[in-house]
Amino acid sequence: MTSNNTAHRSATKRLFKTCALAAGLGLMSLPAFAGDSALYGPTAPKGSTFVRVYNASSAEISASVGNTNLNEVAPLGSTAFSFMPQGDYTAKLGSQSVPVKLASDHYYTLVNNASGKPQLVEEPPFKNKQKSLVRVQNLSDKSLTLKTADGKTEVVNTVAAKGTGEREINPVKVSLALYDGDKKVTDVKPVALERGEAAVLYITGSGSSLSPVWVKPPVATR
């Protein structure tokens, strides 16, 4: 009898330990999921519009779109994309304001130029997970071609002034340059092209004073 009681007590203790462990794991799982939410941030509601800022000037600026503050933006720096409801807004970049119309499910970059008014540039999202995308946003006053630094291979065919061009390529780290015909205009900072990402080269300025800058994070839906 004593042996049976002892066995019963041992089984009961094991059961309590198992229940306690299960309860502990259950309690731990709640903050774990909460942590995931904090880590990845809120999900954009269906029909949202997405906008970021690229500061092409040599001075830090503050930026906002409507009531959405996009924080301080360093010289030649950019923000991550922020989402908001579609609609008409006033964008403020530094001391300048510009009206913008933002459509649902569209991506945009607001460019703060070194001189002149800010510009709103649409950025179609890139969805190919196997390739990289090189996109050229040519906001300058001349047609330009993006080639390998040695000029032997065209990466993005000639892009007209105020135009856009792009090409999907395999992921690679590459040194590139801008050409006006066969004449090299300027080298471009090397960029590491990642699978499933778009590297967007913004070219601002005019004449012989051009400023090519890669703007990342990329336009990508994941």
Curated annotation (Swiss-Prot):
Signal peptide: 1-34
One Gene Ontology biological process: alginic acid biosynthetic process
Domain of life: Bacteria
Official protein name in the record: Alginate biosynthesis protein AlgF
Transcription regulation as UniProt keyword: no
Gene: algF
Annotated source species: Pseudomonas syringae pv. tomato (strain ATCC BAA-871 / DC3000)
Pathway in which this enzyme or protein is active: Glycan biosynthesis; alginate biosynthesis
Pfam family, one: AlgF
UniProt keyword Signal, yes or no: yes
Location, primary (coarse class): periplasm
Swiss-Prot/TrEMBL keywords: Alginate biosynthesis, Periplasm, Signal
One GO CC annotation: periplasmic space
